From Swiss-Prot:
Its EC number is 2.1.3.15. It is found in: Cytoplasm. Belongs to the AccD/PCCB family. Component of the acetyl coenzyme A carboxylase (ACC) complex. Biotin carboxylase (BC) catalyzes the carboxylation of biotin on its carrier protein (BCCP) and then the CO(2) group is transferred by the transcarboxylase to acetyl-CoA to form malonyl-CoA. This is Acetyl-coenzyme A carboxylase carboxyl transferase subunit beta 2. InterPro entries: AcCoA_carboxyl_beta (IPR034733), Acetyl_CoA_COase_Trfase_b_su (IPR000438), ClpP/crotonase-like_dom_sf (IPR029045), COA_CT_N (IPR011762). Acetyl-CoA carboxylase is a heterohexamer composed of biotin carboxyl carrier protein (AccB), biotin carboxylase (AccC) and two subunits each of ACCase subunit alpha (AccA) and ACCase subunit beta (AccD). The lineage of its organism: Bacteria, Bacillati, Bacillota, Bacilli, Lactobacillales. Disulfide bonds: none annotated. Zn(2+) binds at C30, C33, C48, C51. Keywords: ATP-binding, Cytoplasm, Fatty acid biosynthesis, Fatty acid metabolism, Lipid biosynthesis, Lipid metabolism, Metal-binding, Nucleotide-binding, Transferase, Zinc, Zinc-finger. Its cofactor is Zn(2+). The gene is accD2.
Length: 281
């Protein structure tokens, strides 16, 4: 008869080795809570089951989650080829291939229930959703179209800020889009922003924070300058929840934090309340 062996729990090092041997597609680590989870557990909405953080989604997937139908506008608009920086032009081509878009924002007219609205969704796979001249032009055209047609606008923001390769031309888009937003507001029309991770830089400093109703996904990073830049400037370490959606909500900068699976229903309810109709959604 063989003697019984005592069970020994694996050491941290053994666990680390086992994790390293797990196929990449099987597990996903949340960038916010740093917990590992099975990729299939993220579900169709790609949400961390531990902290509700929403992983970054392609623009077209966002559109499918938020609308019943969608008609894209200005699909061919892209950065002018007059830029004389070969490295930048090469980056643009890689971004187009990765995102299947010609620019860092997808714009068009969407429908949800009986409501029609302008929709802009920023694409992080296109140079981190950076704000370039063509990006600003597409968003401006969206607001101008919706002002003419008396439609509300919904913007889903996700950006690293103004596109540095385009210099002042990119920075000018902040004022350009803000003017279009102001004209839309003067016409008495609704503007809803949905801030997602990350919304930073010139996008935060302009149209992302100009919504009449401002929503955000849980744990989204929202700010202007990056954390390291701020640390070096003030010579202090900001708190762990610095620039997170929950902190902005607590300080009055947001109206509501909405989990990704509930965004469509919340948007429909807001359109019902503001555009007229039965509130049975």
């Amino acid at each position: 008869m063989m003697p019984k062996r005592k069970f020994q729990a694996p050491t941290e090092r053994q666990l680390a080795v086992r994790r390293d041997n797990i196929p990449d597609a099987l597990l996903t680590r949340c960038p916010v809570c740093h917990e590992d989870c099975y990729t299939q557990d993220l579900g169709e909405f790609k949400v961390c089951p531990h902290c509700d953080y929403g992983f970054r989604l392609p623009a077209w997937q966002r559109v499918q989650q938020l609308t019943a139908s969608f008609e894209e506008r200005d699909a061919d608009l892209s950065a002018p080829v007059s830029f004389d920086d070969p490295a930048y032009l090469e980056k643009l081509q890689r971004a187009k291939a990765a995102s299947h878009l010609n620019e860092s924002v997808l714009t068009g007219i969407g429908t949800l229930a009986t409501y029609q609205f302008g929709l802009g969704v920023m694409e992080t796979k296109f140079m981190m959703g950076s704000l370039g001249a063509a990006t600003g032009e597409k968003i401006t055209r969206l607001f101008e179209t919706c002002t003419t047609q008396k439609l509300p606008v919904v913007m889903v923001t996700a950006s690293g800020g103004a596109r540095m390769q385009e210099g002042a031309r990119a920075l000018m888009q902040m004022a350009k889009v803000s003017t279009a937003v102001a004209n839309h507001r003067k016409a008495g029309l609704l503007y809803i922003t949905i801030l997602t991770d990350p919304t930073t830089g010139g996008v935060t400093a302009s149209f992302a924070m100009q919504g009449d109703i401002m929503l955000s996904e849980p744990r989204a990073l929202i700010g202007f300058a990056g954390r390291r830049v701020i640390e070096q400037t003030i010579q202090q370490t900001p708190p762990a929840d610095f620039q997170r959606a929950e902190t902005l909500l607590a300080n009055g900068w947001l109206d509501q934090i909405v989990p990704r699976p509930a965004l469509r229903k919340t948007l429909q309810r807001l359109l019902t309340i503001t555009q007229g109709g039965h509130q049975d959604v």
